[in-house]
Curated annotation (Swiss-Prot):
Keywords: Ribonucleoprotein, Ribosomal protein, RNA-binding, rRNA-binding
Pfam families cross-referenced by the UniProt entry: Ribosomal_L9_C (PF03948), Ribosomal_L9_N (PF01281)
A single Gene Ontology CC term: ribonucleoprotein complex
UniProt-recorded name of the protein: Large ribosomal subunit protein bL9
GO molecular function, one term: rRNA binding
Described purpose of this protein according to its UniProt entry: Binds to the 23S rRNA.
PROSITE patterns associated with the record: RIBOSOMAL_L9 (PS00651)
High-level lineage: Bacteria, Bacillati, Cyanobacteriota, Cyanophyceae, Oscillatoriophycideae
Family from the record: Belongs to the bacterial ribosomal protein bL9 family.
GO BP terms: translation
NCBIfam families referenced in this protein's UniProt entry, alphabetically: L9
PANTHER family from the UniProt entry: 50S RIBOSOMAL PROTEIN L9
Length: 152
């Protein structure tokens, strides 16, 4: 049975692990591919400690991002419903449509928060009325707000 050696991955490697993981691989794979390509480093005690420190720091950063998103969610939902004026034709049908950019702009004007328009899910809006819109602030946090489309 061949000996195995431990390496710390510097980036994600399919079927092996994520950045910062300590994995055991065949010595030839480590010496001939992983280490020369910069994909991994030899797992010494100091390197393992440093990798654990980096992982903990990354975990704390992700937690802080999620808490920031929760704060933004509260601020956005507190001011709901938001009014968007649109030109109206007959039968209360609006000209054009309400886009995610319109929603992002109205949130910026009212809540003073800049939101990425790509994270906003707007239903098809063709009439005046109140509509539910989902604003994704973080992979785990989304705000549900109401948009009131009014005549201009």
């Amino acid at each position: 049975m061949a000996k195995r050696m431990q390496v710390i991955l510097n980036q994600k490697v399919s079927k092996l692990g994520e950045n910062g993981d300590v994995v055991e691989v065949a010595p030839g794979y480590a010496r001939n591919y992983l280490i020369p390509q910069g994909v991994a480093v030899l797992a010494t005690k100091g390197a393992i400690k440093q990798a654990e420190f980096r992982k903990e720091k990354e975990r704390q950063r992700l937690l802080a991002e999620k808490q920031e998103a929760e704060t933004r969610k509260t601020a956005i939902e507190k001011l709901s419903p938001y009014s968007i004026p649109k030109q109206v034709g007959e039968n209360e049908a609006i000209f054009g449509t309400v886009t995610s950019q319109d929603v992002a702009t109205v949130i910026l004007e009212n809540a003073k928060l800049e939101i990425d328009r790509r994270g906003i899910t707007v239903p098809d809006i063709g009439q005046l009325g109140v509509y539910k819109v989902q604003v994704k602030l973080h992979p785990e946090v989304s705000a549900d707000i109401e948009i009131k489309v009014i005549a201009q």
